[in-house]
């Protein structure tokens, strides 16, 4: 009924009137802070997508206040300097390189990124190919870099589990990659009585205190500090990869801090390792995010010999505490047609018409 009401009335059907009354009543029951005035003053904003290139492909992804697109482009720019196909999918050298790239990018995320209405993030720097080459120049193929020794780049040198993603394309090639979230399972755990929906706990995406991790282990600094009217930094990474200026891969995923690396690995699986889209989506994944200083791995994602080699290089490896990393949903378009891939890690499906 809530969705039907919003369909009939539009924006005011949620931010004013009956639904707004129900939200405020639930807030008062739970000793919350949101008022009618807060709801009335909220407005969505159009933000330009982040743009990048990788091995001849063009990318469009989500900009701030999501860190996803910026960090995805930064990581791909770093990886472009290495012979990825020669390294081999999920080999010791490949996982080692991914981890070193991810820890540097997530260090930049923690230091530099926040709502651009309140902060001046060095986006040109973070998406610049020269910066990426300099950022990874201290990479050693033989040794892991302890995260304590990895610092954010200097901008003066240059300029959940309750997240849902959908990828859609129509017969004319118009594509949409969309991600929506209430953060953790059931959000804040408060159901709006009479409204039939849960309130989110997106405040956890802010940095409550510099260096203190949130529910996903992510840390941040002043760029993502709590301020009135400010939007928290997220990891949502809805992305469209273009080939010859036309949509080639439409993809995205839930998964909190693992969203960005899930999208990264899926793009690499297709564009570097020549996997079909379902194989690329289903392939085992790993994740690293600077802090904590570990490689998080799905079951069977790292074979024993590779694991021993990574440990010899100095990496710590842990089983991912939620077992599965991300829940990718993707569409690939080529001369043979449209191919949808739903991740078996969750309740996902692919459908056509």
Task: Give residue spans per PLM region.
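Alpha-helical support elements that line or immediately flank enzyme active sites
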Residues: 9-16, 21, 25-27, 77, ...
